[in-house]
């Protein structure tokens, strides 16, 4: 008997998409330019840095033809600060640390300014707005703006795990980095599960779960759990509504039904 297909995108598929994230490498050998589906890749000339898709960077790393430079957020200091924001800041007690700003979106230090999203254009003139994994959220930076807090990109868990598995010797203190990533995942998973408590009110229009800053893998892993809870609450609400209608019909049949009761209920709702 075949099992039903999982809802939404699966974790292996999310990891596959994350391999298109651009990372920074330091080539150890010369390599001619490549023509890929995502666009051309410039020739690799040591010791000049280059930005490549993660899957190609991992391939060159396994062949010992390049070293991968970790993104700024994958340093122990940055992860420790993000973990502190997630656990100790009252503002983010039930929320997630702010994600990196999108193109045209003001950063935290420029909060209050009007966002101006700048579109990009395809070779045939089509307009589009880039989004992960097509944003430079995982490339190395020589200079990080002062006052700009570190933030986790959309594919933080997948990129961090793959870099720890294949390029741990290129990371700063990989053991501590792995521990901090594990703690961050546990803290954020607990927030997602605790947010399910408000879904009962959300099913009746009373609230919802804020998912701003949630990563791709977290969405994929929590989709089945949250969808199951919502379906269960919907069934419970339907049974309550059916029982209420049956009670109304019985009261009307007995002549004891008061129409003003529904008006009061609607006003309270």
Curated annotation (Swiss-Prot):
<keyword id="KW-0235">DNA replication</keyword>
<protein>
    <recommendedName>
        <fullName>DNA replication complex GINS protein psf2</fullName>
    </recommendedName>
</protein>
<comment type="subunit">
    <text>Component of the GINS complex which is a heterotetramer of sld5, psf1, psf2 and psf3.</text>
</comment>
<dbReference type="Pfam" id="PF05916">
    <property type="entry name" value="Sld5"/>
</dbReference>
<feature type="region of interest" description="Disordered">
    <location>
        <begin position="241"/>
        <end position="269"/>
    </location>
</feature>
<keyword id="KW-0159">Chromosome partition</keyword>
<dbReference type="InterPro" id="IPR021151">
    <property type="entry name" value="GINS_A"/>
</dbReference>
<dbReference type="GO" id="GO:0007059">
    <property type="term" value="P:chromosome segregation"/>
</dbReference>
<dbReference type="Pfam" id="PF25005">
    <property type="entry name" value="PSF2_N"/>
</dbReference>
<feature type="region of interest" description="Disordered">
    <location>
        <begin position="92"/>
        <end position="112"/>
    </location>
</feature>
<dbReference type="GO" id="GO:0000727">
    <property type="term" value="P:double-strand break repair via break-induced replication"/>
</dbReference>
<dbReference type="GO" id="GO:0000811">
    <property type="term" value="C:GINS complex"/>
</dbReference>
<comment type="similarity">
    <text>Belongs to the GINS2/PSF2 family.</text>
</comment>
<comment type="function">
    <text>The GINS complex plays an essential role in the initiation of DNA replication. Has a role in chromosome segregation.</text>
</comment>
<keyword id="KW-0539">Nucleus</keyword>
<dbReference type="GO" id="GO:0006260">
    <property type="term" value="P:DNA replication"/>
</dbReference>
<dbReference type="InterPro" id="IPR056784">
    <property type="entry name" value="PSF2_N"/>
</dbReference>
<dbReference type="InterPro" id="IPR036224">
    <property type="entry name" value="GINS_bundle-like_dom_sf"/>
</dbReference>
<feature type="compositionally biased region" description="Acidic residues">
    <location>
        <begin position="260"/>
        <end position="269"/>
    </location>
</feature>
<dbReference type="InterPro" id="IPR007257">
    <property type="entry name" value="GINS_Psf2"/>
</dbReference>
């Amino acid at each position: 008997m075949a099992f039903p297909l999982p809802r939404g995108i699966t974790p292996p598929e999310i990891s596959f998409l994350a391999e298109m994230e651009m990372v920074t490498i330091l080539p150890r050998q010369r390599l001619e330019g490549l023509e890929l589906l995502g666009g051309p890749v410039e020739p690799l000339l040591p010791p000049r840095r280059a930005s490549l898709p993660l899957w190609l960077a991992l391939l060159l790393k396994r062949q010992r033809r390049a070293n991968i430079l970790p993104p700024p957020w994958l340093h122990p200091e940055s992860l420790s600060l993000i973990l502190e924001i997630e656990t100790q800041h009252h503002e983010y007690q039930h929320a997630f640390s702010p994600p990196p700003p999108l193109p045209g979106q003001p950063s935290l230090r420029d909060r209050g300014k009007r966002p101006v999203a700048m579109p990009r254009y395809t070779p045939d003139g089509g307009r589009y707005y880039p989004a992960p994994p097509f944003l430079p959220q995982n490339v190395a930076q020589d200079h990080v703006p002062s006052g700009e807090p570190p933030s986790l990109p959309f594919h933080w868990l997948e990129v961090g795990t793959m870099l720890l598995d294949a390029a741990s010797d290129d990371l700063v203190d990989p053991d501590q980095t792995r521990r901090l990533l594990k703690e961050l995942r546990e803290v954020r998973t607990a927030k997602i599960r605790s947010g399910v408590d408000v879904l009962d009110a959300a099913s009746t229009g009373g609230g919802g779960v804020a998912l701003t800053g949630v990563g791709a893998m977290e969405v994929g892993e929590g989709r089945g759990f949250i969808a199951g809870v919502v379906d269960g609450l919907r069934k419970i609400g339907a049974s309550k509504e059916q029982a209420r209608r049956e009670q109304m019909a019985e009261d009307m049949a007995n002549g004891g039904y008061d129409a003003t009761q529904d008006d009061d209920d609607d006003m309270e709702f």
